[in-house]
Design a protein with these regions (language model features):
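C-terminal and inter-domain tail/linker signature
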Residues: 1-257
Length: 257
């Protein structure tokens, strides 16, 4: 008999939805003996995942998985969470064989639409151009390393098709000009950002997620940036920024990244 091939994206979507429903079955995708949690606000071993999800479901949450992608042993999802307050988050799950053994995330509060009328989540959700996955990964890696990390802004426009960029950052408007002004700290948006380190780049087709460490207004922060590419150029951008608490406040010792 041939082994059953599990749809990892479907498993993760069911898992995330079980936060809302309290259903215990999707939690079986975790290997709870090997599971490594990188959310510094979550304590390992304090309660089983089944009990945790059941408790969360009693708060009447709503969970909407906007888009999900798969890259080798990784699944990454872009999700709306409504608990006590409304949040937007990226979750990254690493599989070993049939089970999740590691998890990272980056969450920020939902905000009003930006000046271009766009929210943190709307837009295309299905990956295309799967034959270009590695090319697109390299394109985003080069952009992050060159423009965001090394701050070589003269090369920024090389990564876009003319002046076009669909921008979902709540502080920015559409267009490459507004993006460059924000990076150069001359846009009047009231924030400064630095990206000294790129940790991970995940990709499926024309969607690429970069995971970076840096600071916002001199506060240690994590940056998850999702790009949609078209014809080899960056065409659309979503992201979340989350403050990283001081090590003394961490509830596990696994690190944010």
């Amino acid at each position: 008999m041939m082994p059953v091939v599990q749809d990892r994206k479907a498993q993760i979507c069911a898992l995330l939805k079980s936060i809302e429903t309290g259903e215990p079955e999707p939690i079986a995708v975790f290997n709870q003996q090997q599971y490594i949690q990188h959310n510094p606000h979550t304590q390992e071993g304090s309660e089983g995942l089944e009990e945790l999800f059941k408790r969360l479901s009693q708060t009447s949450p709503r969970v909407n998985i906007v888009r999900a992608f798969e890259d080798g042993d990784y699944v990454f999802a872009h999700t709306e969470y409504d608990f006590v307050r409304s949040n937007i988050g990226f979750g990254v799950f690493r599989f070993e064989n049939d089970h999740v053994v590691e998890h990272w995330d980056n969450i920020q509060p939902r905000q009003d639409p930006n000046i271009s009328g766009l929210t943190l989540v709307e837009g295309p959700s299905e990956a295309t151009d799967h034959n270009l996955t590695e090319t697109n990964r390299q394109t985003v890696s080069a952009f992050v390393e060159t423009v965001l990390v090394r701050r070589q802004f003269a090369q920024l426009e090389d990564h876009f098709e003319g002046s076009e960029l669909i921008q979902h950052n709540p502080q920015l408007s559409n267009g490459v000009k507004a993006f460059r002004a924000a990076l150069e700290e001359r846009n009047g948006a009231g924030f400064t950002i630095e990206y000294p380190r790129l940790h991970r780049v995940l990709a499926e087709g024309n969607f690429v997620l970069s995971v970076s460490e840096g600071s916002r207004n001199d506060v240690h922060s994590s940056f998850y940036d999702l790009f949609r590419l078209s014809k080899g150029k960056l065409a659309e951008h979503w992201g979340t920024i989350e403050d990283i608490p001081p090590h003394s406040a961490w509830k596990n010792d696994n690190g944010k990244f």
